[in-house]
């Protein structure tokens, strides 16, 4: 009987770093990270400190310069005449530059103010107002959402806008009327934008017409007029209609205005 003997192979030793080595690597990593953070913080502190030192040095130089000027004025013998003359010359140059810059700034501000005064914004927007008069010229009032920018444009006699400055103006008008009221004739309803210049006859700038309607209840129709015209100082513009009794004076229906371009 043959007995076989199998010898078991020895177990392989566990691979990997020892615990002491792992601890050392961990501490080294923490140290490096801490050192980088500390270096960054120190760099920021050093930069701010250098800026502060630079400011203090500049202030100190300014103080020394002003102190030297004071000593030159008091006539202290510790300074030579040549140094005093040179320092005074530098100081006078600085003061001269400051005064010139100040004068230039004042001139620029004054020019801007004069420019604004020379080209003020001129605008007007007025609302229609019912009138018992039978005149064909529509009446207007400064009410509701009206605009009257300044005294360079005025509403005179409640019927015409008068400008006091020459220039190009955009003039507009909207007239809303009831088209099915009994009219004296079958002629269309006509709205005209008219100009009255000093020493000249009245003339029509724009005109629009709309036909009557038999629709009931009252059929509202609107006429729009608008254009750009050259106006002289003292010129007046107004709106003329064929039948003012048909004009609707409700909110936003009929309005009139101008704007200087």
Swiss-Prot record:
The soluble form derives from the membrane form by proteolytic processing. The lineage of its organism: Eukaryota, Metazoa, Chordata, Craniata, Vertebrata. The gene is CD40LG. Residues 1-22 are cytoplasmic. Glycans are attached at residue 240. It is found in: Cell membrane; Cell surface. This is CD40 ligand. Coiled coil: none annotated. Specifically expressed on activated CD4+ T-lymphocytes. The record marks 112-113 as: Cleavage. The keyword Ribonucleoprotein does not apply. It comes from the Eukaryota.
């Amino acid at each position: 009987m043959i007995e076989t003997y199998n010898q078991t192979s020895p177990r392989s030793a566990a691979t990997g770093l020892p615990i002491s080595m792992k601890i050392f690597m961990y501490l080294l990593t923490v140290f490096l990270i801490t050192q980088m953070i500390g270096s960054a913080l120190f760099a920021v502190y050093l930069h701010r400190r250098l800026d502060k030192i630079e400011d203090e040095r500049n202030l100190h130089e300014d103080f020394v310069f002003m102190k030297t000027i004071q000593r030159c004025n008091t006539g202290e013998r510790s300074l030579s005449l040549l140094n005093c003359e040179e320092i005074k010359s530098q100081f006078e140059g600085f003061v001269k530059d400051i005064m010139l810059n100040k004068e230039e700034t004042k001139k620029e501000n004054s020019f801007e103010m004069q420019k604004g005064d020379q080209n003020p914004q001129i605008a007007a927007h007025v609302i229609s107002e019912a009138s018992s008069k039978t005149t064909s010229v529509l009446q207007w009032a400064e009410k509701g959402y009206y605009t009257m920018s300044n005294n360079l444009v005025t509403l005179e006699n409640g019927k015409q806008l008068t400008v006091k400055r020459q220039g190009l103006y955009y003039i507009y008008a909207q007239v809303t009327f009831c088209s099915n009221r009994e009219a004296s004739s079958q002629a269309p309803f006509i709205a005209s934008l008219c100009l009255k210049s000093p020493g000249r006859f009245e003339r029509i700038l724009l005109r629009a017409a709309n036909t009557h309607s038999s629709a009931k209840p009252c059929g509202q129709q609107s006429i729009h007029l608008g254009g750009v015209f050259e106006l002289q100082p003292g010129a007046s513009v107004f709106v003329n209609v064929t039948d003012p009794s048909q004009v609707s004076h409700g909110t936003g229906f009929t309005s009139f205005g101008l704007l200087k371009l």
